[in-house]
């Protein structure tokens, strides 16, 4: 099973609505869950199966103007990592596939939703982010055909990874995020330990 349905709702969070958020999750999260729920009994009966859930680098790092999309992909990651533990005993492998920028129509106006700026305080940021994101359309470094071949290889693997980053740009972004997390973890170790109770 390859869960690949999704779209990006772009826009600064304060300029999005509750309906926008629910629509984003309906496609990117709940649709994926519904299909997975329907397929799992068949895989469980066969004691084998592969589930590849398409996330994104946006499922590990937040990006301004993509809060709803990032939130939906964080949900895909959390769901997938949890599901993997539940179904492993039945020979079912779950892999989170996290592509970087792949040369698709994702940044084409037909594929995303991007409301006009409505709050003057955000106007400059909105303009700058549009100028950064939108010109990348059809100039993304990742090759969708090569991604497809890699997914076939993952599906055929005897021991597929729990999480796989697709594209060197994805690997670089994950490396950067891991370094940030490690630095924050180290800086806050003493405060973190201060929460431990002295129960003995």
Name each model-derived stretch.
Residues 4-9:
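Conserved NAD(P)H cofactor-binding loop of Rossmann-fold oxidoreductase domains
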Residues 12-13, 20-22:
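Substrate-binding pocket helix/loop in short-chain dehydrogenase/reductase
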Residues 14, 61-68:
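Active-site loop immediately N-terminal to the catalytic Tyr-X3-Lys motif
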Residues 36, 72:
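Active-site helix of classical SDR
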Residues 56:
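Residue(s) in the substrate-gating loop at a strand-loop-helix junction
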Residues 61, 82-92:
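Active-site-adjacent segment of SDR/Rossmann-fold oxidoreductases
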Residues 89-160:
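SDR active-site lid
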